[in-house]
From Swiss-Prot:
Pfam families in alphabetical order: Pro_isomerase (PF00160)
InterPro entries: Cyclophilin-like_dom_sf, Cyclophilin-type_PPIase, Cyclophilin-type_PPIase_CS, Cyclophilin-type_PPIase_dom
Gene name tied to this protein: cpr2
SUPFAM superfamilies, per database record: Cyclophilin-like
Family: Belongs to the cyclophilin-type PPIase family. PPIase B subfamily.
Keywords on record: Endoplasmic reticulum, Glycoprotein, Isomerase, Rotamase, Signal
Native organism: Aspergillus oryzae (strain ATCC 42149 / RIB 40) (Yellow koji mold)
Domain of life: Eukaryota
Documented EC number(s): 5.2.1.8
Motif Prevents secretion from ER per record, residues: 189-192
Protein name: Peptidyl-prolyl cis-trans isomerase B
Main location group: endoplasmic reticulum
Domain PPIase cyclophilin-type span(s) in chain numbering: 23-180
A GO term for molecular function: cyclosporin A binding
Localization: Endoplasmic reticulum lumen
Length: 192
């Protein structure tokens, strides 16, 4: 039997001293929206979590800072991470252009989950999405690797921005600053 766990089960056990916590400071149309803080499931999906963490810090010379949320679908998700083209056709990982699906142990069971966007099996790069509802039809197709810890109201604000055809925000929704946070309570939860 495959070890599939709900996000709720992971959340209650997931975090340990190895938790990476990253943030995005976001603007919409050059006006600050706020900060989203994301916890990464580093023990369950270490390669995927490390890719996202390194792209959030920009430590490899490229990453999320300055990139946009290019696709927003109400009652589904917000998508970003294409820092090379900005339209959903680009991006790259810290491991090269694409990397394999690490595993599908965590299911898309609630809003606020962080998952890899892809163009099919084993095509992970830098694009990601944050769910705004449970999305079980994505289980086994997209790797869940974290969740929103703080600032979900910013995700909701992005979800509700006016859009043009193609689900693109009418005004730019930009990650103006991103990085890694030192968390004082990293050790307060047990991870898998």
């Amino acid at each position: 039997m495959t070890d599939l766990r709900s996000a709720e089960e992971i959340t209650s056990q997931q975090y340990s001293s190895g938790l990476a916590t990253v943030y995005f400071d976001i603007e919409h149309g050059n006006k600050p929206l706020g900060r989203v803080v994301l916890g990464l499931y580093g023990k369950t999906v270490p390669k995927t979590a490390e890719n996202f963490r390194a792209l959030a810090t920009g430590e490899k010379g490229f990453g999320y800072e300055g990139s946009t949320f290019h696709r927003v679908i109400k009652e589904f998700m917000i998508q970003g991470g294409d820092f090379t083209r900005g339209d959903g056709t680009g991006g790259k990982s810290i491991y090269g252009e694409k990397f394999k699906d690490e595993n599908f142990k965590i299911r898309h069971t609630k809003k606020g989950l962080l998952s890899m966007a892809n163009a099919g099996k084993d095509t992970n790069g830098s694009q990601f999405f944050i769910t705004t509802v449970a999305t079980p039809w994505l289980d086994g197709r997209h790797v869940v690797f974290g969740e929103v810890l703080e600032g979900y109201e910013v995700v909701e604000a992005i979800e509700n921005v006016p859009k043009v055809p193609g689900d693109k925000p009418q005004q730019v929704v930009k990650i103006v600053k991103s990085g890694e946070l030192e968390s004082e309570d990293k050790g307060s939860h047990e991870e898998l």
